[in-house]
UniProtKB/Swiss-Prot annotation:
The gene is bamC. The keyword Ion transport does not apply. Part of the Bam complex. It comes from Vibrio atlanticus (strain LGP32). This is Outer membrane protein assembly factor BamC. Disulfide bonds: none annotated. GO terms for biological process: Gram-negative-bacterium-type cell outer membrane assembly; protein insertion into membrane. The keyword Protein biosynthesis does not apply. Keywords: Cell outer membrane, Lipoprotein, Membrane, Palmitate, Signal. Residues 1-19 form the signal peptide. One of its GO terms (cellular component) is cell outer membrane.
Length: 348
């Protein structure tokens, strides 16, 4: 599902959600009929007086009071996933609410400010606002999964619990067309995720823009050396912030012979396939080839504040030997300087 939005008269934010082809009913309901709803009530099984019944509980239907839709009320659309775009954040979904947990206060403050900026940028009205709580006005969603325009209102809050910082989005009011209705569990879960993803996307875009600017303004070379992580294990240390180094990876690693396959900035992982560069490359940089067998490897990047740790694991998830990491240090340092010099020459 894709997001787009348009602004209409009256500062009303309208979000357009596009989906697959077919009518809204076809996308929300099961394809077959609902004759099972006409099934008559079960009657008590009558046994002859001299019969000795044997009961097996394996297939007993649990007794109890169960609530939920049936037939056409059952929404078959897959759950809306929350995008993991904030490094270090953990997402918790409970009773349809979405909570982001962060360890550092400055990260939580940035997420909060991102949400405030996103509401302003997208012309979402605010009914009430305090230091830690926001109640929005109606947000209109135009979705191909719905027959009418959908309106929703949210409460957004931030708080602390168990030495962590929480950021929560909760759908509080629901409207279909001009008619207000109770908030269903399905809609609460789905449209909480939609608004959370808008905040996530804005945070990610801001972070990328900031990192790109820092990378452009960085004039001194990146010192790279061997060191150890917080657990004392040997790692490569790049003396530059994580976000700055991340922006340069698509240039650095391919130059060394690594073809990028997967990247996940929030988890700090890059999966790449290695094929040793030719002799000309090693002669040009004046270093011995690294003793690394061709294959798939995963780079693990850790945020150490103004530094970044780098480790490498093989296809089985086993860390490569310390000696191999040491042999990669001068190569990585040379390539970092070389790619930076080429970028500066191009800008001039």
């Amino acid at each position: 599902m894709k997001y787009s939005h348009q602004l209409v008269i009256g500062s009303l934010a309208v979000f357009v959600l596009t989906a697959c082809s077919g009518s809204p009913t076809q996308r929300r309901q099961a394809k077959d009929d609902f004759e099972y709803l006409e099934t008559p009530e079960f009657s008590q099984w009558q046994l002859p007086e001299d019969a000795q019944p044997q009961f097996y509980p394996n297939f007993d239907i649990p007794s109890g009071e169960f609530s939920g839709g049936t037939g056409r009320q059952v929404d078959i659309r897959p759950p809306q996933q929350v995008l993991e775009l904030i490094p270090g954040a953990r997402t918790e979904r409970q009773n349809g609410e979405v909570t982001l947990w962060l360890l550092r206060a400055e990260e939580a403050d940035r997420v909060w400010q991102t949400a405030v900026d996103m509401l302003t940028q997208r012309n979402i009205g605010i009914r009430e606002q305090s230091e830690n709580d926001i109640e929005t006005d109606w947000v209109t969603w135009v979705s191909e999964d719905e027959e009418v325009e959908i309106g929703s209102r949210y409460s957004i809050s931030r708080f602390q619990a168990n030495n962590r910082h929480g950021f929560k989005i909760n759908l509080i009011d629901w409207r279909e067309g001009s008619e207000e209705k109770p908030v269903s569990a399905t809609n609460k879960e789905r449209y909480n995720a939609f608004l959370t993803n808008l905040v996530m996307a804005r945070y990610d875009a801001d972070l990328r823009a900031e990192a790109a600017l820092k990378a452009q303004e960085l004039v001194k070379r990146i010192p790279i050396s061997m060191g150890s992580d917080r657990s004392g294990f040997p790692v490569i240390i790049a003396r530059t912030p994580y976000n700055v180094l991340w922006q340069r990876l698509p240039t650095l690693l391919p130059t060394m012979g690594f073809e990028l396959e997967e990247r996940n900035q929030s988890q700090g992982t890059v999966k790449a396939k290695y094929a040793a560069p030719d002799d000309e490359f090693w002669e040009e940089i004046g270093l011995q080839p690294i003793d690394l067998a061709p294959g798939t490897y995963t780079f693990l990047f850790g945020d150490l504040g103004n530094r970044t740790s780098i480790n490498v694991t093989d296809a089985s998830g086993k860390p490569v030997e310390e000696e191999l990491l040491k042999s990669m240090v001068p190569v990585l340092a040379h390539v970092a300087d070389q790619t930076k010099d080429k970028k500066e020459a191009k800008s001039e």
